[in-house]
Amino acid sequence: MASYSTNEFKGGLKVLIDGNPMVIVENEFVKPGKGQAFNRVKLKNLLNDRVVEKTFKSGESVEAADVEELTTVYSYFDGDSYVFMHPETFEQYMVSEEALGETKKWLKDQDEYQVILFNGQPISIIAPNFVNLEIIETDPGLKGDTAGTGGKPATLSTGAVVRVPLFVQTGEIIKVDTRTSTYVSRVKD
């Protein structure tokens, strides 16, 4: 199995720590005036999304995680798990609701998602940065009603709720940023 030295650490690198796959979020090289240099690293656990901070002595090695990212298409929900299919090999991946996490509110049939596999098992799903979804319920915007924030809540076809401008109506399709859960624009047909 491959390993990484501390001088190869950078954001996005996937490593194995105590048997858990982790991704490096932040890496800071520290060279004190006295003593050995070290790396202060923030790591995000890919299994439970917890962020931990660890320090590694300069020159130390860490095992690479057997993590694979695949582009897949969301197919359907079979009652227990969500089924994603690889578009070229047609291989299906069953993903539990726990592994899906917050991405569940952005699931739309036939959209592409990144499936993260650890030892061949799906452990998490990454939604695209932007999705186009239909508004199924929102209050009508009243003309001149801008005393508040200038926005209103809207329920989308997936069940997610986002704040939208007053001019947006039920039945319209909007573009949403999945990273921040915010309205971006209306989608023209």
From Swiss-Prot:
It holds the Pfam family EFP_N. It is found in: Cytoplasm. Its main location: cytoplasm. One of its GO terms (biological process) is peptide biosynthetic process. May be beta-lysylated on the epsilon-amino group of Lys-34 by the combined action of EpmA and EpmB, and then hydroxylated on the C5 position of the same residue by EpmC (if this protein is present). Lysylation is critical for the stimulatory effect of EF-P on peptide-bond formation. The lysylation moiety may extend toward the peptidyltransferase center and stabilize the terminal 3-CCA end of the tRNA. Hydroxylation of the C5 position on Lys-34 may allow additional potential stabilizing hydrogen-bond interactions with the P-tRNA. The keyword Protein biosynthesis applies. GO terms for molecular function: translation elongation factor activity. Belongs to the elongation factor P family. This is Elongation factor P.
